[in-house]
Amino acid sequence: MEYINWDNYSLEDLFGDIDNYTYNTEMPIIPADSAPCRPESLDINKYAVVVIYVLVFVLNLLGNSLVIMVVLYSRVSHSVTDVYLLNLAIADLLFALTLPIWAVSKVKGWIFGTPLCKIVSLLKEVNFYSGILLLASISMDRYLAIVHATRRLTQKKHWVKFICLGIWALSLILSLPIFVFRRAINPPYSSPVCYEDMGTNTTKLRIVMRALPQTFGFIVPLMIMLFCYGLTLRTLFEAHMGQKHRAMRVIFAVVLVFLLCWLPYNLVADTLMRLQAIEETCQRRNDIGRALDATEILGFFHSCLNPLIYAFIGQKFRHGLLKIMAFHGLISKEYLPKDSRPSFVGSSSANTSTTF
């Protein structure tokens, strides 16, 4: 073995010109699609959402409590629409109880654990499905009363009770997938969330899981509403009824407000990126997150707008509310109308006029 004499070598011979050596400090370029996606959130946006949630909570409690109070204080038998509106107000009140929890989760993340995640998610879904199913039932009731000028079916109160029970049962069934798969999750780079967890195939299974409930709990009732209210409007135009202008305002409000409040959220949540209609990137994921927040607020607002649309616009509701206030001494009886009827949904079985 040959011996190497290291005394004949210098560092420059071994490693070259160290002083003039250049180091490559540049990091390799990482594609945007491969980079970890950190959710973008601003504290000011979080607190703005919380303020809106509190506002919806207060308006929801006040408006729907008044609706329930006026219906229950009525001294005559309730009309069919009264029963539907009573159930609608109860559904909105149940949803209102979850708003403080959603407000806290916007700031702190989901800190309430899996059981409460399942419960509040269930109440939110039941409120949505029961709301649109009840509205579809109201549209069918108006359709029968005005287009066919008959109340023979809808005047049977026990049928109305069974219909409402069926709506609550169907809403619960449509909401079960959310209840089963929702849990508290701690994702990387963000706060804990309340979301569906179905393993490695969450995205594909979520599409399947949402397709059936959205079809029977959103699209079908919406088509029923559009069909019934469309024919109702045509009948009002052709008959030249005295109350048609008021009825048209309320009917347009029913359809337009529901579409404005819930259609954007369902479009963003259940199509687009989540249905892989557009390519998923980090930036688009954050954009979709912000869009979900904005459209979800619109959907939440619908729960407190219902009393304004289906009750406060109606003259009979105002008369009923004034009677209650006069009975408790809050206002003078001089303010009471002389010919106010107890039912706040002013429908008539003798003709097709309606003051919805």
From Swiss-Prot:
Chief localisation class: membrane
GO cellular component, one term: external side of plasma membrane
Entry superkingdom: Eukaryota
Any Pfam family the entry gives: 7tm_1
Post-translational modification comment from the UniProt entry: Phosphorylated upon ligand binding; which is required for desensitization.
Location within or outside the cell: Cell membrane
Family the UniProt entry places it in: Belongs to the G-protein coupled receptor 1 family.
InterPro entries to which the protein is assigned, alphabetical: CCR1-9-like, Chemokine_CXCR2, Chemokine_CXCR_1/2, GPCR_Rhodpsn, GPCR_Rhodpsn_7TM
Record PROSITE patterns: G_PROTEIN_RECEP_F1_1 (PS00237), G_PROTEIN_RECEP_F1_2 (PS50262)
Cytoplasmic topological domain residue ranges: 74-82, 141-161, 230-249, 312-356
CDD domains: 7tmA_CXCR1_2
Glycosylation sites recorded in the entry for this protein: 8, 20
Membrane-protein topology: Multi-pass membrane protein
Gene Ontology molecular function: C-C chemokine binding; C-C chemokine receptor activity; C-X-C chemokine receptor activity; interleukin-8 binding
Side of membrane Extracellular, spans: 1-46, 104-118, 182-206, 270-290
Disulfide bonds: 117-194
Assembly: Interacts with IL8. Interacts with GNAI2.
PANTHER family documented for this protein: C-X-C CHEMOKINE RECEPTOR TYPE 2 (PTHR10489:SF689), CELL ADHESION MOLECULE (PTHR10489)
UniProtKB keywords: Cell membrane, Chemotaxis, Disulfide bond, G-protein coupled receptor, Glycoprotein, Membrane, Phosphoprotein, Receptor, Transducer, Transmembrane, Transmembrane helix
GO terms classed as biological process: calcium-mediated signaling; immune response; neutrophil chemotaxis; positive regulation of cytosolic calcium ion concentration
Record-given protein name: C-X-C chemokine receptor type 2
Transmembrane segments: 47-73, 83-103, 119-140, 162-181, 207-229, 250-269, 291-311
Function: Receptor for interleukin-8 which is a powerful neutrophil chemotactic factor. Binding of IL-8 to the receptor causes activation of neutrophils. This response is mediated via a G-protein that activates a phosphatidylinositol-calcium second messenger system. Binds to IL-8 with high affinity. Also binds with high affinity to CXCL3, GRO/MGSA and NAP-2.
